[in-house]
Amino acid sequence: MTTILKHLPAGQRIGIAFSGGLDTSAALLWMRQKGAVPYAYTANLGQPDEDDYDAIPRRAMEYGAENARLIDCRKQLVAEGIAAIQCGAFHNTTGGLTYFNTTPLGRAVTGTMLVAAMKEDGVNIWGDGSTYKGNDIERFYRYGLLTNAELQIYKPWLDTDFIDELGGRHEMSEFMIACGFDYKMSVEKAYSTDSNMLGATHEAKDLEFLNSSVKIVNPIMGVKFWDESVKIPAEEVTVRFEQGHPVALNGKTFSDDVEMMLEANRIGGRHGLGMSDQIENRIIEAKSRGIYEAPGMALLHIAYERLLTGIHNEDTIEQYHSHGRQLGKLLYQGRWFDSQALMLRDGLQRWVASQITGEVTLELRRGNDYSILNTVSDNLTYKAERLTMEKGESVFSPDDRIGQLTMRNLDITDTREKLFGYAKAGLLTASSATGLPQVENLENKAK
């Protein structure tokens, strides 16, 4: 069976991930006119720039959908977002600022839940708006086939017939108007935006040029913290975790995790927390640039890692970062539910996250400027009295430290001999700007 269909399968049911925007609206109407039987599926991901989800399926029916469903994906999305925080599943960082993989998390949820809904309706052909140059076409492909082994893929944007007729936004708008729908193109922004409850992605158009900065972006989850005319008073916030799960913000608990994430977004968003500018490597190994918002994810991540560093030992923290980066890359590639990702997730959640219980108090200022004011946990292995610089009882004595330092003589001697060997091999050259002349002198004295 051919998995990818290059031309419209007339007479067959086709499920389309329907956003209500111009592209998917024109595609749905065009497919119906060409003889297909389109079914529309809209994911409610808590998009901050969408205020009427119920209207989207109604529009799909007007454009010719055989049926249209709104699938509430918010609970699952937040669950996956919390799992990513617990695992540190983030691999793109620039200058200490993190991209929280919010789009890949959204695709993992959308790709599985929408295809599952299609399967219930007997729809085994799926289309969406992803282009052939991006990451999403592969993410949706993988998640779709994981959910339904019989799935076939039809994308209007890979169909030359569709492209020849409706290859641009102007043509699509004219097509909608000609068919009796007064669908005017929205005002063109200098970039495109994709969002869900966890974060927003701004990319393409002017943002493809590196001399266009964050200053051209209008945040949809936060504020323009770079604009000095925007007043942003400092704010203290306390985040509580229990066994790796965020349970309270400023002492307030929530009926469900969706409400908790919305409040975290509101708190972080008031300051522009979690906004970053990243150059990343797409799945096809070409570089792209995006500006990201994730105020709630950033707030929870900061508090989580503060507790992590106070609770776990050095090697565990190192493995958390190493495995988290691996897992973040798998998530980015659309492999969040692959066996290698599940293995990493299980270990990080079982042995690391389960011990993260406590509270962290932060002072948020502008953008990513914050201070940690207090850290409280019964699980802390950080104990001030163990290494206090003040006089008092100590867990070890000066003689103990002398013995420990003496043991270091073995590896110091080994390192010195290696440096001599490197110098003799010409790999190191003595220079007045380095300590190597002294090493040579020591070698001569040893002779």
Swiss-Prot record:
What taxonomic ancestry is recorded? Bacteria, Pseudomonadati, Pseudomonadota, Gammaproteobacteria, Enterobacterales
Q: What is its main location?
A: cytoplasm
What PANTHER family does the record point to?
Answer: ARGININOSUCCINATE SYNTHASE (PTHR11587:SF2)
Q: In which pathway does it act?
A: Amino-acid biosynthesis; L-arginine biosynthesis; L-arginine from L-ornithine and carbamoyl phosphate: step 2/3
Query: What name is this protein filed under?
Result: Argininosuccinate synthase
Q: How is the quaternary structure described? A: Homotetramer.
The organism of origin for this protein: Salmonella typhi
The entry's localization annotation reads: Cytoplasm
Q: Gene3D superfamilies attached here?
A: 1.10.287.400, Argininosuccinate synthetase, chain A, domain 2 (3.90.1260.10), HUPs (3.40.50.620)
What the entry lists under InterPro entries is as follows:
Arg_succ_synth_type2_subfam (IPR023437), Arginosuc_syn_C (IPR048268), Arginosuc_syn_N (IPR048267), Arginosuc_synth (IPR001518), Arginosuc_synth_CS (IPR018223), Arginosuc_synth_type_1_subfam (IPR023434), AS_cat/multimer_dom_body (IPR024074), AS_multimer_C_tail (IPR024073)
Q: What is its EC number?
A: 6.3.4.5
Catalysed reaction equations from the record? L-citrulline + L-aspartate + ATP = 2-(N(omega)-L-arginino)succinate + AMP + diphosphate + H(+)
Name any GO cellular component annotation.
cytoplasm
UniProt key word Transferase: no
Q: Could you say which protein family the record assigns here?
A: Belongs to the argininosuccinate synthase family. Type 2 subfamily.
